[in-house]
């Protein structure tokens, strides 16, 4: 049986029905009467009696003539009595009550008329959606046939009869204080009005099949069938077979009651045939019907009571009272399935009533519903449909079938606006791209349909400039949330992209908020970029602005150069350029650039400076074929400035206020567009300023695309014979063959229409030019950066990352040039901004292109310890942390010695162009300081708030660059960089800062700091001083790709010179000759340059040594005694040793030398020594010439006092030297000790030494004379300071040497007890140090 395709059209609008609120004024209130007290009631009468009494008294006394003055007092009393009687009486008069009641009743009559008008509208709307069943026969073939779809509110709502329903309009009475005070008649009238008008009787009422799963119907068989026929008739009249299927199981299937169902297309089984055509979901056995429906029911989810727009709804009727539905598969609720069971089993009286599984009973022309405990009215007058009426309706519908190419589960309104239909595409999954992209006439270019108008005609969107007959170049679209703005934008873009190649059109989609719809176009070949989520990634907004400026400049330059080449002067527009191409000149095409700026008002709120950008591009773009569509949810005239003045066409979707609608389209119609998803995409287009708005609905392109299906089976019969068309399946005759075609093609996974088209377009033609490079969001491996930079080895240049230059539409390597003025570098960044990682990249990149003899690195790690990962790299000479102060000092010592060495060699200044330098083993040297803030706060105290080594860093920055010594530092704050150092740091790179206000990067005229655009979640991302974004390459230091071992393997046997440290135990032979001349002894090795430390006792004959126990004091004395004795004779040197603890008792002295450990011997020994030295003074009476030539005769005397703090400085209490102090004879000789041959060496404990220098006469004199001082190990908290230096916890033998110079020096003292086989270096201590 052949059928005609029914083409559904736009649904006719039903009569309007308001669902607002009618507010009713409350009835008038009567004043509450409060009875007065007895006294108040009696007082007027008492006053009246008093007045009469006064008058009688006046008359009785003979006052015949009463003056007015006499009557004044009675008159006042009369007024008071009247006031007391009437003053507080709140009781309303009867006339007043009657008047207020009449006014209110007249008001209620007006309200009643309004309510009745609302009720009439509601009834008319209900009758339109649910007409009487007798009127259904006139619907087939009309515009109303199959008008409902899943987006309509009455979809799958079947009329069941007429019932009393609540009024859709809410009736609300204004609040009153208390109903007791209301006027009774008015109150009663109001109550009567509300009780009567809140419901409407005899209104068509329906059953929503989406909210129920099984429906059980009881009652007399004929009435039940009549009711079900009415339900089915309503369902098949209003719903397309693609959205609703009907199935029936009845014993008397071929009877008059159900035989008519065979004519309906809704019962057909897709893809199955019998002898007469499509098979039908009709059966006499419910189980057989379930088998037919098995494939359809198998994959359906459980019933939820919610609409299922993506599933075809099934209405299954089981007319078999004896069938146990609860034991069948149909008892399981499934989404999109409603089962109606005609049953004869009444519910148990305690059976629970389930709203999703109603039990209905048809009785006496009405329908009742089972509620817990009994039957309740459900439908007052049930609809019934006779078998003849049903057969007539079914035959009228039998001639129609739904359109096999339409998806079915879409709005009837959008079916008429199908994207493929408007573009003439039969199958979007098999596009003829060459035909779609075929060259067009200019008047047809950029002109595409994007929807349908209110009359059903295609709405053409013409992007061309108005001078070329279009609507452009620029437009404005406004639509609130839910209005279909994204749907309309996608429709415009998909139409343009489907019909134009990248040689004619390219697109930039900029979405400030980051909607998902924008990403759908990312893979189209014409799409230059999809820029989304600019609200969170502010750098994207800056790149977008730079890209637009750059494209305008690029096109302007292209027109200028091409015009000069062709005609001698620049082309004024792309139109002239294309005319030159048409004239035969070989020029590359310039495609139209279509820019969609979605949510541009939000962009302007965060970036107000972009208003000028859009204005500039809009003005310049008119000639350069750059078209912009501005889209947003609202229109803020104060923010958009002159943008709206540059737009030609306007699109207004649903907006939030009439004023916005007037601003967009000139009238308020956009505000009055109805809300709801069924009205998404409805709007008005104003093609030109002042034109009449055109109402339209855009096509829906964001849904799943289902390609059209073709029949896979045909019926072949050799001898045609008539067959009886029955409801049940008709078996074919032996001569009939139902032949299947080829095997079913495997079904592709569901895909959206945009993705389906985009995948095909990507395989054709050229892609859009790369105007937009992706932002620096992806990590750049160091290996990739090295490959892209193309820098060769031994050029003293290496890449650090990439610089983003969106204006020029390219990325350039970020290259460090060691031989340039930017040879010193500072990296400024906040916490976790990637500073330490950047240093790793810097070192590894240099090491990848140079040998350890060409570049070497010395690192001070005050950061997170990340530089420690590079300590095994051959190019790294040392990595020192904050816990290694000695290594830090030695690093500076090595670099300063290198600087001094190169300064002394003038040839270093004459390095050749090839970088050749005198070979000192270092090459280009880099001092790398990670975290200058931490470095500057190290080695400080309350008097020295900055690290003294900062001055040495500043010296290297300002002087070292000319001698191949570079400084690379990182700092969290630019303020931490000393002023004297800043000018020497030629390269400044700024990473993300904690506060953008600390940034040093500025752009003249910009309203925002460029640092605001640096992402917070991307370490290594930053700005150059030119405000260009860059990204450091990642050093790739993971376990699998660690480059350290690979780089070291390329340079076997080569390494940067290490930082040499002082040995922890210094053997005498390690410093060479110990005795460098009279009174010149080598006592150790200096940390600064590892040179020997010479103690010149002739220049400064006084030496103080302080240190805690086992720090090396006595060991130094032992070394001095041995060295002097071994290189002197008894006639030249003599010793006086005061050793309280007998540590030096085994040291051999010269004969007759004084050694004592007895405190009683100290005073006579000092007296004898003082007399001896005093005798060396020149005698009196010598001339000046004699004095200048005079020298003392005798030996040099060494006074060695070990542990001077152990010798009491108090006067002797007994003996021959009573009252004398031990050091008094000596103190007077100390100032001339050098001239008189006296050398005094004292040692003492570190603890309390600062106090002793102020209290002990001997030590105070030493300090006054600036004696050479050695500060060995001591507790910094207990020992105080000596000449501004604090003791430190040092290894044994390590000391701070204080001389008359400004700076202290760390030294390692010689240990004479070290075994001769011990070598100089970081060896374990051999021999004791005390």
Curated annotation (Swiss-Prot):
ATP binds at residues 479-486, 829-836, 1107-1114. Signal peptide: none annotated. Residues 456-662, 811-1000, 1090-1280 form the FtsK domain. The keyword NADP does not apply. It is a multi-pass membrane protein. Disulfide bonds: none annotated. It is found in: Cell inner membrane. The keyword Lyase does not apply. Coiled coil: none annotated. It comes from the Bacteria. PROSITE patterns: FTSK (PS50901). Keywords: ATP-binding, Cell inner membrane, Cell membrane, Membrane, Nucleotide-binding, Repeat, Transmembrane, Transmembrane helix, Transport. The chain crosses the membrane at residues 43-63, 65-85. One of its GO terms (cellular component) is plasma membrane. Induction: Repressed by IdeR in the presence of iron and by Zur in the presence of zinc. One of its GO terms (molecular function) is ATP hydrolysis activity. Pfam families: FtsK_SpoIIIE. InterPro entries: AAA+_ATPase, EccCa-like_Actinobacteria, EccCb-like_Actinobacteria, FtsK/SpoIIIE/SftA, FtsK_dom, P-loop_NTPase. Was identified as a high-confidence drug target. Part of the ESX-3 / type VII secretion system (T7SS), which is composed of cytosolic and membrane components. The ESX-3 membrane complex is composed of EccB3, EccC3, EccD3 and EccE3. Part of the ESX-3 specialized secretion system, which is important for iron and zinc uptake or homeostasis. NCBIfam families: T7SS_EccC_a, T7SS_EccC_b. This is ESX-3 secretion system protein EccC3. The lineage of its organism: Bacteria, Bacillati, Actinomycetota, Actinomycetes, Mycobacteriales.
């Amino acid at each position: 049986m052949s059928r005609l395709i029914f083409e559904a059209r736009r649904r006719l609008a039903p009569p309007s029905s308001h669902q607002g609120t009618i507010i009713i004024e409350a009835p008038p209130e009567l004043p509450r009467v409060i009875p007065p007290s007895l006294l108040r009631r009696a007082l007027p009468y008492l006053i009246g009696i008093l007045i009469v009494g006064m008058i009688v008294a006046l008359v009785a006394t003979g006052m015949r003539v009463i003056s007015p003055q006499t009557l004044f007092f009675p008159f006042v009393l009369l007024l008071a009595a009247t006031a007391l009687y009437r003053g507080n009486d709140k009781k309303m008069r009867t006339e007043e009550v009657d008047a207020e009641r009449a006014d209110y009743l007249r008001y209620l009559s007006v309200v009643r008329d309004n309510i009745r008008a609302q009720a009439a509208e509601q009834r008319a709307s209900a009758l339109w959606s649910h007409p009487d069943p007798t009127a259904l026969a006139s619907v087939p073939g009309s515009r109303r046939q199959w008008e409902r779809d899943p987006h309509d509110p009455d979809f799958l709502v079947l009329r069941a009869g007429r019932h009393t329903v609540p009024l859709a309009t809410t009736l609300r009475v204004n609040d009153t204080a208390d109903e007791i005070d209301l006027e009774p008649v008015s109150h009663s009238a109001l109550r009567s009005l509300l009780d009567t008008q809140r419901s409407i009787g005899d209104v068509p009422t329906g059953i929503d099949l989406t909210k129920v799963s099984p429906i059980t119907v009881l009652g007399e068989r004929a009435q039940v069938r009549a009711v079900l026929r009415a339900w089915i008739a309503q369902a098949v009249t209003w719903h397309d077979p693609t959205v609703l299927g009907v199935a029936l199981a009845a014993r008397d299937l071929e009877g008059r009651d159900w035989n008519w169902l065979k004519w309906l297309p809704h019962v057909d089984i897709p893809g199955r045939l019998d002898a007469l055509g499509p098979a039908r979901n009709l059966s006499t056995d419910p189980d057989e019907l379930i088998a037919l429906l098995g494939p359809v029911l198998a994959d359906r989810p459980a019933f939820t009571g919610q609409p299922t727009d993506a599933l075809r709804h099934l209405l299954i009727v089981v007319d078999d009272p004896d069938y146990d539905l609860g034991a069948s598969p149909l008892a399981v609720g499934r989404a999109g399935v409603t089962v109606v069971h005609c049953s004869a089993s009444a519910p148990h009286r305690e059976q629970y009533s389930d709203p999703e599984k109603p039990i209905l009973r048809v009785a006496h022309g009405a329908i009742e519903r089972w509620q817990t405990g009994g039957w309740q009215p459900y439908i007052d007058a049930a609809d019934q449909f006779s078998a003849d009426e049903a057969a007539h309706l079914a035959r009228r519908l039998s001639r129609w079938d739904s359109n096999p190419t339409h998806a079915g589960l879409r709005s009837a309104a959008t079916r008429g606006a199908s994207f493929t239909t408007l573009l003439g595409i039969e199958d979007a999954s098999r596009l003829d791209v060459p035909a779609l992209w075929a060259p067009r006439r200019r008047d047809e270019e950029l002109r595409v349909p994007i929807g349908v108008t209110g009359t059903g005609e295609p709405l053409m969107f013409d992007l061309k400039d108005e001078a070329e007959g279009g609507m452009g170049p620029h437009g404005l679209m406004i639509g609130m949330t839910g209005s279909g703005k994204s749907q309309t934008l996608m429709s415009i873009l998909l139409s343009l992209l489907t019909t134009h190649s990248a040689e004619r059109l390219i697109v930039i989609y900029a979405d400030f908020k980051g909607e998902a719809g924008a990403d759908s176009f990312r893979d189209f070949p014409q799409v230059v970029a999809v820029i989304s989520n600019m609200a969170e990634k502010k750098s994207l907004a800056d790149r977008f602005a730079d890209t637009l400026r750059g494209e305008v400049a690029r096109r302007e330059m292209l027109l200028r150069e091409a015009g000069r080449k062709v005609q001698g002067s620049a082309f004024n527009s792309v139109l002239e350029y294309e005319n030159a191409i048409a004239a035969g000149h070989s020029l590359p095409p310039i495609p139209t650039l279509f820019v969609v700026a979605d949510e541009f008002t939000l962009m302007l709120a965060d970036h107000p400076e972009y208003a000028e950008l859009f204005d500039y591009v809009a003005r310049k773009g008119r000639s350069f074929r750059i078209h912009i569509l501005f889209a947003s949810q609202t229109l803020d005239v104060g923010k958009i400035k002159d943008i709206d003045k540059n737009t030609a066409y306007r699109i207004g979707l649903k907006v939030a206020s009439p004023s916005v609608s007037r601003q967009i389209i000139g009238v308020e119609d956009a505000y009055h567009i109805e809300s709801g998803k069924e009205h998404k995409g409805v709007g008005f287009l104003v093609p030109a300023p002042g034109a009449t708005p055109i109402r339209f609905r855009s096509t829906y392109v964001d849904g799943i695309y289902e390609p059209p299906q073709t029949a896979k089976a045909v019926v072949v019969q050799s001898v045609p014979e008539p067959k009886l068309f029955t409801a049940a399946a008709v078996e074919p005759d032996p001569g009939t063959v139902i032949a299947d075609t080829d095997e079913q093609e495997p079904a592709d996974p569901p895909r959206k229409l945009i993705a389906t088209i985009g995948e095909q377009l990507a395989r054709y033609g050229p892609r859009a030019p790369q105007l937009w490079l992706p932002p620096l969001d992806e990590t750049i491996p160091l290996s990739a950066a090295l490959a892209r930079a193309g820098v060769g080895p031994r050029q003293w240049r290496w890449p650090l990352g990439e610089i983003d230059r969106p204006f020029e539409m390219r990325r350039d390597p970020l290259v460090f040039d060691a031989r340039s003025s930017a040879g010193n570098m500072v990296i400024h960044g906040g916490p976790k901004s990637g500073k330490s990682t950047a240093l790793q990249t810097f070192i590894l990149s240099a090491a990848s292109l140079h040998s350890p003899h060409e570049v070497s690195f010395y690192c001070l790690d005050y950061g997170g310890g990340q530089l420690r990962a590079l300590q095994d790299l051959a190019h790294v000479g040392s990595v020192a942390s904050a816990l290694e102060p000695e290594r830090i000092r030695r690093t500076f010592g090595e670099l300063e010695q290198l600087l001094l060495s190169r300064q002394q060699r003038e040839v270093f200044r004459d390095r050749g162009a090839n970088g050749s330098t005198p070979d000192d083993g270092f090459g280009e040297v880099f001092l790398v300081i990670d975290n200058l803030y931490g470095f500057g706060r190290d080695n400080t105290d309350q008097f020295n708030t900055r690290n003294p080594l900062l001055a040495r860093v500043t010296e290297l920055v300002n002087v070292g660059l000319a001698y191949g010594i570079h400084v690379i530092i990182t700092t969290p704050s630019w303020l931490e960089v000393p002023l004297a150092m800043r000018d020497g740091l030629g390269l400044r790179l700024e990473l993300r800062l904690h506060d953008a206000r600390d940034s040093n990067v500025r752009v003249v005229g910009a309203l925002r700091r460029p640092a605001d655009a640096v992402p917070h979640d991307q370490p290594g991302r930053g700005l150059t001083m030119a405000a260009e974004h860059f990204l450091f390459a990642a050093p790739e230091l993971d376990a699998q790709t660690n480059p350290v071992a690979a780089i070291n393997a390329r340079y076997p046997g080569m390494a940067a010179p290490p930082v040499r440290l002082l040995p922890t135990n210094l053997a005498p032979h390690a410093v060479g000759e110990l005795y460098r001349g009279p009174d010149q002894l080598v006592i150790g090795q200096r940390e600064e340059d590892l040179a020997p430390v010479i103690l010149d006792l002739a220049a400064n004959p006084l030496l103080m040594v302080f240190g805690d126990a086992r720090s090396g004091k006595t060991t130094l004395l032992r070394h001095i005694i041995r060295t002097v004795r071994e290189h002197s004779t008894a006639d030249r040197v003599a010793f006086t040793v005061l050793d309280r603890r007998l540590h030096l008792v085994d040291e051999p002295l010269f004969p007759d030398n004084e050694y004592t450990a007895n405190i009683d011997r100290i005073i006579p020994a000092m007296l004898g020594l003082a007399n001896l030295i005093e005798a060396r003074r020149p005698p009196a009476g010598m001339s000046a010439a004699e004095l200048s030539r005079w020298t003392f005769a005798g030996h040099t005397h060494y006074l060695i006092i070990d542990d001077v703090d152990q010798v009491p400085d108090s006067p002797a209490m007994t003996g021959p030297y009573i009252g004398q102090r031990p050091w008094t004879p000596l103190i007077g000789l100390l100032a001339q000790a050098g001239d008189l041959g006296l050398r005094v060496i004292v040692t003492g404990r570190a603890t309390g030494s600062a106090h002793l220098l102020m209290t002990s006469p001997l030590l105070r004199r030493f300090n006054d004379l600036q004696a050479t001082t050695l500060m060995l190990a001591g507790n910094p908290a207990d020992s105080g300071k000596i000449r501004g230096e604090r003791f430190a916890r040092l290894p044994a033998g390590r000391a701070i040497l204080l001389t008359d110079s400004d700076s202290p020096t760390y030294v390692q003292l010689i240990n004479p007890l070290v075994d001769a086989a011990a070598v100089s270096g970081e060896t374990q201590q051999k021999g004791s140090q005390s």
